């Protein structure tokens, strides 16, 4: 494929934008080569500036569960934009959106709209600290919750350690209040609570790990977290920025039947526009200003365009059969990818929950960040590049899952499986 114009645009961008991109994974650093510059999207496909077409499994990193340029979403945005893009004042759609989210998500009685997943998690943690009057939080290795200082923490040695900054610029004092333990490891959680339980304000977790590939919770893991946090008076926060409205209409908490105290949301909730949200029990959420003393604000929070796109997306997803179709297509895709690897004798593990799919090039069952890191990253890079040449766009990282949308067709899935076979064959020759 010719991608000459993309190469030229990336070279120019690097003069004006750090690394040439506005979010690091877009630079293709982990897979080599230059990023593809996109001109437009339509349904299940994206088209680059050089005229190439790709079946897309990135979907803007998850939000576009209806596919690109969905007619109803575009119509809603166009209608609202004609009336004004932002007012800095309440609108009727904000309440409509909040009401629908409260009806859909089991844990949410009251919800506050923000502009990103990072804002949502940052605000939820401040709320948890203010509500419990405690300082420390627990997170899990390999779970990404946005780029707020207290969440950019990696685990040290031992069962549970006080965090060390995972990025320059994160103060050690901030890191000191973040406890990191391995995902899917209840024994480590219990030991951490023995050491720090009296000062743990919250445990924040991706109920399905989505930033180390796709890593489902082991049986009993989420139930154990719920039991332990209740015992210690610690809030349980589900970060459903990725899983919310994707693995089920009510998110992972509906799928697994576990109700957290607070939930953070993003991606799908905005229908492709910048939206985040956090919500939960009324008595906790009533502590947020102006109802309570815990401050959080946003100039563009709940803006009309975002509410129109998000509301329309959730209405479409509420229609009968939506998740059954996603499940059918995603199951076929996962089956086809795994069959290809088996036929070619390639070491692999295939993880899937709903329309989140990840093929790891390792024989080791992937249950946490350490096991995810056993994947053959060099082979993945080659696989990615060959797949791109076949006209299939997957995330340019072994540690990001594929997203299936309602716009994908049976033909798209079969073409992807066929392309995957050829790409694997070349990558492992």
Swiss-Prot record:
GO terms for cellular component: cytoplasm. Homodimer. It comes from the Bacteria. Belongs to the class-III pyridoxal-phosphate-dependent aminotransferase family. HemL subfamily. Keywords: Cytoplasm, Isomerase, Porphyrin biosynthesis, Pyridoxal phosphate. The modification N6-(pyridoxal phosphate)lysine is found at residue 267. The keyword Hydrolase does not apply. It is an enzyme of class 5 (isomerase). One of its GO terms (biological process) is protoporphyrinogen IX biosynthetic process. Its EC number is 5.4.3.8. Its cofactor is pyridoxal 5'-phosphate. The gene is hemL2. This is Glutamate-1-semialdehyde 2,1-aminomutase 2. GO terms for molecular function: glutamate-1-semialdehyde 2,1-aminomutase activity; pyridoxal phosphate binding; transaminase activity. InterPro entries: 4pyrrol_synth_GluAld_NH2Trfase, Aminotrans_3, Aminotrans_3_PPA_site, PyrdxlP-dep_Trfase, PyrdxlP-dep_Trfase_major, PyrdxlP-dep_Trfase_small. Pathway: Porphyrin-containing compound metabolism; protoporphyrin-IX biosynthesis; 5-aminolevulinate from L-glutamyl-tRNA(Glu): step 2/2. It is found in: Cytoplasm. It catalyses: (S)-4-amino-5-oxopentanoate = 5-aminolevulinate. It holds the Pfam family Aminotran_3.
């Amino acid at each position: 494929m010719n991608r000459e114009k993309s190469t030229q645009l990336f070279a120019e961008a690097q003069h004006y934008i750090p690394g040439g991109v506005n979010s690091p994974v877009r630079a293709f650093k982990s897979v080599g080569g230059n990023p593809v510059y996109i001109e437009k999207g339509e349904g299940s496909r994206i088209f680059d500036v050089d005229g190439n077409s790709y079946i897309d499994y990135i979907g803007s990193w998850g939000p576009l569960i209806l596919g690109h340029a969905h007619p109803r979403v575009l119509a809603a945005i166009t209608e609202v934009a004609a009336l004004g893009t932002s007012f800095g004042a309440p609108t009727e759609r904000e309440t409509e959106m909040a009401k629908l989210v409260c009806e859909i998500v089991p844990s949410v009685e009251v919800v506050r709209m923000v502009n990103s997943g990072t804002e949502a998690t940052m605000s939820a943690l401040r709320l948890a600290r203010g509500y419990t009057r405690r300082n420390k939080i627990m997170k899990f290795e390999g779970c990404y919750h946005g780029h707020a200082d207290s969440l950019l923490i990696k685990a040290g040695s031992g069962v549970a350690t006080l965090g060390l900054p995972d990025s320059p610029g994160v103060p050690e004092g901030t890191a000191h209040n973040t406890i990191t333990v391995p995902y899917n490891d209840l024994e480590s959680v219990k030991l951490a609570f023995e050491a720090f339980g009296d000062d743990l304000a919250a445990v924040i977790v991706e109920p399905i790990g989505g930033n180390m590939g796709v890593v489902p919770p082991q049986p009993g893991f989420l139930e154990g977290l719920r039991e332990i946090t209740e015992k210690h008076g610690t809030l349980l926060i589900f970060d459903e920025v990725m899983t919310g409205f994707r693995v089920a209409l009510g998110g992972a908490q509906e799928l697994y039947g576990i109700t957290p105290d607070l939930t953070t949301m993003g991606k799908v909730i905005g229908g492709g526009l910048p939206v985040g949200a956090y919500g939960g029990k009324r008595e906790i959420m009533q502590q947020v200003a102006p109802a309570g003393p815990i401050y959080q604000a946003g100039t563009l929070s709940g803006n009309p365009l975002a509410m129109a796109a998000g509301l329309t997306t959730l209405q479409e997803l509420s229609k009968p059969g939506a998740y059954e179709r996603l499940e059918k297509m995603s199951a076929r895709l996962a089956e086809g990818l795994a069959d290809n690897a088996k036929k070619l004798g390639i070491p692999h593990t295939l993880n899937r929950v709903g329309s989140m799919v990840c093929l790891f090039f390792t024989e080791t069952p992937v249950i946490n960040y350490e096991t995810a890191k056993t994947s053959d990253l060099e082979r993945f890079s080659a696989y990615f590049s060959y797949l791109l040449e076949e006209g299939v766009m997957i995330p340019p990282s072994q540690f990001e899952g594929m997203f299936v949308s309602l716009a994908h067709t049976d033909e798209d899935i079969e073409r992807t499986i066929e392309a995957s076979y050829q790409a694997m064959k070349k990558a492992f020759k």
